[in-house]
């Protein structure tokens, strides 16, 4: 067995490169551009399916599920894919805890890309995750940007989760802190 195949098999998920002409990739690119990614070149988008972590997702059956960004370093991606996102993992470098321990997500590409460092081997590449978060009631003390999401501003995927279609030039800067790791799962890896 090739070593790369061994690593991919050990992750416990499938990684599928989205076709350049797929509608799914178009919606994701539009979402990225409308949330601040227009200064970055989107090189590739990978969809994560059949993750062994999916069986633990959303144990409280929250009906509000949204897509958010999560910036991370390239060296963290394999661990995230195999074990899921963690609340303040021991091996992670400290990058701020403005709202305490939790998984920090954002509705803004511009905020999340700051936490994504360049690949050491390929100096021009960064990675950002699109994650699905199952949310219960919001804690108003922690909300920096709150608005009602109208139905016409969302795209429902085949899997039933919502992708926000943010109007052009809309400024988003919300930080969402999820306190339970089982309420978050990785759906896409974006290479920029």
Q: PLM features: residue spans?
A:
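Active-site and NAD+-binding cores of ADP-ribose-processing enzymes
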Residues: 1, 78, 87-91, 116-192
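Intrinsically disordered, low-complexity terminal and linker regions
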Residues: 1-76, 176-192
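Ordered, helix-dominated protein-protein interaction surfaces in large eukaryotic regulatory proteins
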Residues: 6, 30, 47, 71, ...
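Intrinsically disordered, low-complexity regulatory regions enriched in Ser/Pro/Gly/Thr
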Residues: 38-39, 59-63, 95-99, 105, ...
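Short, solvent-exposed polar/charged micro-motifs at secondary-structure junctions
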Residues: 52-58, 79-81, 139-143
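Extended catalytic/binding region for NAD+/ADP-ribose chemistry, centered on the ART fold
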Residues: 68-75, 89-121, 131
């Amino acid at each position: 067995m090739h070593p790369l195949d061994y690593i991919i098999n050990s992750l416990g998920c499938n990684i599928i490169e989205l076709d350049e002409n797929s509608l799914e990739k178009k919606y994701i690119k539009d979402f990225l551009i409308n949330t601040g990614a227009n200064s970055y070149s989107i090189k590739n988008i990978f969809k994560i399916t059949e993750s062994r972590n999916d069986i633990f997702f959303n144990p409280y059956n929250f009906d509000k599920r949204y897509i958010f960004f999560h910036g991370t370093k390239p060296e963290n991606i394999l661990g995230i894919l195999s074990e899921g996102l963690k609340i303040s993992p021991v091996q992670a470098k400290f990058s701020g805890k403005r709202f305490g321990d939790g998984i920090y997500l954002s509705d803004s590409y511009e905020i999340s890309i700051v936490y994504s460092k360049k690949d050491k081997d390929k100096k021009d590449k960064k990675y950002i995750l699109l994650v699905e978060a199952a949310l219960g009631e919001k804690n108003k003390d922690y909300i920096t940007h709150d608005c009602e999401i109208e139905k016409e501003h969302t795209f429902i995927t085949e899997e039933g989760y919502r992708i926000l279609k943010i109007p052009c030039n809309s400024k988003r800067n919300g930080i969402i802190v999820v306190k339970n790791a089982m309420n978050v799962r990785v759906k896409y890896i974006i290479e920029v």
